[in-house]
């Protein structure tokens, strides 16, 4: 039961006592034996009777008050099906290869990871990116401002600083050239200020890259060989379905787990440039110097073999018998305690009896109702409800209830003798358990129990986040109205609409997210035309130029650039066929242009 229901109960109990007292005074001959007053009920049997009535009427009144939120929640479930689903705990792990490994091992996305600590229950996570476990690692990282010792690269004359990464094989007998990898994925680890400044330098100030061996440049690359990670559907972390708008998911990930965007790929590598040596260097040249960052960078800030993980596992729910007397059935994972299990999404619903099986029933709001005689017209409906009590513990969570209905949304009511059994498979999380596991001092303990490869060590690089739940009940009215009206940024209210979108998706409302929202001071959109080069052919394309005004007094420059990178990808999701969007950010303090991102449509850069 929630605190909200307690208010209803107390209100009904006070009403019964007050009205009972008035009734007793008005009709003393009839109601004298009730012995009621507003402060006390003398007869304990009457007191219990009133408390029972107050409980029942409180339930009825709460159901009536919640009737409209249930409607808006159902509509949100139809148009934005994942909005009210809990967002499980997320983190970043690093996998170190064995010292005897001679080649790269790829851990696929979706690999099971367990995270635990002594005295805590085990939590199941899944990897979100394909992860390269390499036979080498970053041994040293340092940033040098000009003048610096060079490697005779052509770009050095224009460089004002250089980031030097030293790669070293796990064994002196293994050369870097043995690796056939054409891509390396790095993770920017450490304090957010360091990671964001390094991110800004790589994607705003980088003018060239060189593979260096013994102080000499062996191969040079351009900034186009750098690719930001986390902006395509294959690199999602929050488990939203394809029915949900990917731009919304991207903003939610940015607001609640920005670490997923701190990965970058170095493409089109040829490690044979390092020859037979077990060591080599990669230098990144920048057109800006940074005295503060020069003192902060270490090898811990740039890591290989990392991936985001999310607290998610597939489980079978306890089978339930479909009965005419029941209108919905609460889902409980088999062999899991209620305080450490919570349903995130339903994967499959099956109905069966002694001679029929209805497998993979569709959800009622999927919009795929069938009239074929060979298929059953039976559907399932999911309802979520916040509860603060699970398994005898005060443990906040969101319970899931399933109803079985026909195409008229009437309950499926079979005869009791037919013995229908409902089985459900769902994706679940460990409720709030993952965020409670201690972090630091060698904890938590991380392993991959289903992976056959031997790894020397797996460690957690960031504290697992708390499980996040969007507000429901009365809040759903405002949410529904905003979800329908906010994705319009071309009018004078564009900046306000953008702030409202971020506020709607900032479920926790932390001071950091509030500052981010307040930093957006203005927005302007104009029609533009750009030249497009595709497959060697040149053409012209119409698009929308978006200019955002951001306050430098509220956000630092590296925070502004990181926000702009995400918003550029977000706006590009709105580009129609044969159009593009291009984001420019200006600073309110000076009015100067801070940065202009490439024109893009969806996940593809055009100009």
Q: Could you describe each region identified by the protein language model?
A:
Residues 45, 49-53, 75, 202, ...:
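Short, Φ-rich (hydrophobic/aromatic) sequence segments
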Residues 1-30, 34, 223-229, 233-273, ...:
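Mixed-charge (acidic/basic) macromolecular-recognition segments
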Residues 87-91, 159-163, 180-182, 205, ...:
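Residues at beta-strand starts and edge strands
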Residues 1-216, 223:
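Extended assembly-interface regions of large multimeric machines
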Residues 1, 55-63, 74-83, 88-103, ...:
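Short linear motifs embedded in intrinsically disordered, proline/glycine-rich low-complexity segments
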Residues 355-607:
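C-terminal domain/tail detector
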Residues 172-382:
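Short, low-complexity Pro/Thr/Gly
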Residues 56-64, 82, 149-181, 309-352, ...:
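Extracellular ectodomain segments of secreted/surface proteins
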């Amino acid at each position: 039961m929630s605190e909200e229901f307690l208010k209803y109960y107390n209100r009904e109990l006070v009403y019964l006592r007050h009205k009972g007292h008035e009734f007793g005074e008005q009709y003393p001959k009839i109601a004298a034996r009730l012995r009621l007053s507003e402060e006390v009920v003398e007869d304990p049997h009457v007191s219990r009777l009133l408390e029972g009535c107050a409980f029942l009427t409180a339930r009825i009144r709460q159901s009536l008050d919640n009737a409209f939120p249930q409607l808006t929640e159902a509509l949100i479930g139809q148009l934005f099906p994942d909005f009210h689903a809990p967002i499980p705990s997320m983190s970043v792990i690093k996998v170190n290869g064995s010292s005897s490994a001679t080649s790269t091992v790829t851990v696929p996305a979706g690999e099971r990871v367990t995270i635990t600590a002594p005295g805590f229950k085990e939590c199941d996570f899944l990897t979100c990116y394909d992860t390269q476990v390499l036979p080498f690692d970053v041994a040293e990282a340092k940033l040098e401002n000009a003048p610096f010792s060079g490697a005779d690269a052509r770009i050095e004359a224009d460089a004002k600083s250089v980031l030097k990464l030293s790669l070293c094989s796990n064994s002196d007998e293994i050369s870097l050239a043995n690796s056939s990898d054409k891509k390396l994925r790095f993770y920017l680890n450490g304090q957010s200020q360091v990671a964001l400044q390094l991110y800004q330098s790589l994607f705003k100030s980088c003018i060239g890259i060189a593979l260096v061996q013994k102080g000499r440049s062996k191969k040079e690359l351009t900034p186009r060989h750098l690719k930001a990670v986390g902006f395509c559907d294959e690199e999602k972390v929050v488990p939203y379905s394809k029915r949900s708008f990917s731009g919304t998911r991207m903003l939610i990930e940015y607001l609640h787990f920005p670490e997923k965007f701190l990965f970058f790929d170095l493409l089109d590598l040829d490690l044979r440039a390092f020859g037979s040596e077990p060591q080599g260097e990669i230098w990144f040249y920048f057109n800006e110097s940074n005295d503060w960052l020069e003192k902060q960078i270490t090898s811990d800030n740039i890591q290989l073999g990392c991936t985001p993980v999310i607290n998610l596992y597939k489980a079978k729910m306890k089978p339930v018998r479909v009965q005419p007397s029941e209108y919905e059935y609460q889902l409980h994972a088999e062999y899991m305690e209620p305080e450490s299990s919570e349903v995130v999404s339903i994967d499959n619903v099956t109905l069966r009896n002694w001679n029929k099986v209805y497998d993979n029933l569709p959800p009622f709001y999927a919009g795929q109702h069938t009239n074929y005689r060979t298929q059953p017209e039976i559907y399932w409906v999911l309802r979520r409800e916040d509860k603060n009590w699970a398994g005898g513990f005060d443990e906040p969570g969101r319970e899931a209830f399933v109803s079985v209905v026909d195409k008229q949304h009437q309950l499926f009511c079979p005869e009791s003798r037919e013995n229908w059994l409902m089985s459900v498979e769902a994706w679940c999380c460990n409720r709030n358990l993952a965020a409670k596991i201690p972090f630091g001092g060698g904890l938590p303990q991380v392993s991959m129990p289903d992976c056959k490869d031997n790894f020397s060590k797996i460690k957690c690089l960031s504290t697992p986040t708390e499980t996040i739940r969007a507000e429901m009940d009365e809040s759903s009215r405002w949410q529904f109205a905003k979800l329908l009206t906010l994705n319009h940024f071309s009018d004078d209210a564009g900046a306000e609409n953008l702030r409202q979108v971020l506020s709607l998706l900032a479920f926790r409302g932390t001071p950091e997210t509030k500052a981010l929202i307040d930093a957006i001071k203005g927005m302007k959109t104009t029609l533009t035309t750009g030249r497009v080069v595709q497959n060697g052919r040149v053409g012209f394309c119409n698009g929308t130029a978006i200019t955002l005004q951001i306050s430098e007094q509220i956000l630092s420059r590296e925070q502004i650039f990181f926000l702009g990178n995400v918003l550029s990808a977000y706006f590009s999701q709105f580009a129609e066929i044969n159009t593009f969007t291009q984001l420019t950010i200006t600073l309110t303090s000076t009015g100067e242009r801070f940065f202009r991102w490439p024109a893009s449509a969806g996940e593809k850069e055009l100009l």
